[in-house]
Amino acid sequence: MPMYQVKPYHGGSAPLHVELPTCMYRLPNVHSKTTSPATDAGHVQETSEPSLQALESRQDDILKRLYELKAAVDGLSKMIHTPDADLDVTNILQADEPTTLATNTLDLNSVLGKDYGALKDIVINANPASPPLSLLVLHRLLCERYRVLSTVHTHSSVKNVPENLVKCFGEQARKQSRHEYQLGFTLIWKNVPKTQMKFSVQTMCPIEGEGNIARFLFSLFGQKHNAVTLTLIDSWVDIAMFQLREGSSKEKAAVFRSMNSALGRSPWLVGNELTVADVVLWSVLQQTGGSSGAAPTNVQRWLKSCENLAPFSTALQLLK
């Protein structure tokens, strides 16, 4: 089949001369028999720049710290999941020295933010069919620490709210102007599926669930704990809300055994000081009827210790 012929674009054996643009760097000819370097290799850096070396060194340090943190977390996880974990954690808790509620101070601005000229007001929506006793206990404890302006309202979605719930904060006679209070605490009895807390619409979303709200309120006391203690406290709060309140009879029995074991080593669930774990577990036990005589010995003793404190005994009157 005949085809058309293309004329050669260079002559015979003469070298090919191509004008290359000067805006790009040159590379050596891969077909050349010589190994001469590129004619213009000024773009190649013989040594790394100091800034690049500093970046590499910083990256190595970060990776080293990450490996150390991973090793620490792995060791802690192994300690908690081994049979002798209780003994190890107890030793760590004894070495820790938590601050007490009575002596520690906290700047509310560091937690709630600074709002010039406005009272920091915490608004809680709660269902009167299931009063969140832990929040009422924490309210009383907050009143012992700060100047709290307390108010109670009833939403139109509920009717016939018991008188003791309407007056759960007692007779609130305002003795000073609003700006002289440090904290506002507003409780609204409302038909809601879960207890809700709203503080600042601009800076934070609502918090749902009695356990989560209790965590937030207890943080206002400024207690300092190490990582192990904080993990145990959060674990007890989750156990109260998910296993003790919503779990099966077997799960509840397992919770009682764990509580009895922990209270056999210390007066409170986590160490020698009252924590939010004690408040939330006590509240759930009262609401679910778990505080009856069927509770183990150490749990019964712990319940009496709670009820000997004024904030607990006052909240307990709301169920009668």
Swiss-Prot record:
Keywords: Apoptosis, Cytoplasm, Developmental protein, Differentiation, Nucleus, Phosphoprotein, Protein biosynthesis, Ubl conjugation. It holds the Pfam family AIMP2_LysRS_bd. Disruption phenotype: Reduced levels of component enzymes and associated factors of the aminoacyl-tRNA synthase complex, lack of complex formation and lethality within two days of birth. Neonates display severe hyperplasia in a number of organs including lung, intestine and liver, lung failure, and disturbed thymocyte proliferation and differentiation. Embryonic fibroblasts deficient in Aimp2 are resistant to apoptosis following UV irradiation. Phosphorylated on serine residues in response to UV irradiation. Ubiquitinated by PRKN, leading to its degradation by the proteasome. Residues 220-317 form the GST C-terminal domain. GO terms for biological process: apoptotic process; negative regulation of cell population proliferation; positive regulation of neuron apoptotic process; positive regulation of protein ubiquitination; protein ubiquitination; protein-containing complex assembly; translation; type II pneumocyte differentiation. Residues 162-225 are annotated as: Interaction with TP53. GO terms for cellular component: aminoacyl-tRNA synthetase multienzyme complex; cytosol; nucleus. InterPro entries: AIMP2, AIMP2_LysRS-bd, AIMP2_thioredoxin, Glutathione-S-Trfase_C_sf, GST_C. It is found in: Cytoplasm, Cytosol; Nucleus. One of its GO terms (molecular function) is molecular adaptor activity. Residues 82-162 are annotated as: Interaction with PRKN. SUPFAM superfamilies: GST C-terminal domain-like (SSF47616). The modification Phosphoserine is found at residue 36. Required for assembly and stability of the aminoacyl-tRNA synthase complex. Mediates ubiquitination and degradation of FUBP1, a transcriptional activator of MYC, leading to MYC down-regulation which is required for aveolar type II cell differentiation. Blocks MDM2-mediated ubiquitination and degradation of p53/TP53. Functions as a proapoptotic factor. Part of the multisynthetase complex (MSC), a multisubunit complex that groups tRNA ligases for Arg (RARS1), Asp (DARS1), Gln (QARS1), Ile (IARS1), Leu (LARS1), Lys (KARS1), Met (MARS1) the bifunctional ligase for Glu and Pro (EPRS1) and the auxiliary subunits AIMP1/p43, AIMP2/p38 and EEF1E1/p18. Interacts (via N-terminus) with KARS1. Interacts with EPRS1. Forms a linear complex that contains MARS1, EEF1E1, EPRS1 and AIMP2 that is at the core of the multisubunit complex. Binds FUBP1 (via C-terminus). This is Aminoacyl tRNA synthase complex-interacting multifunctional protein 2. It comes from Mus musculus.
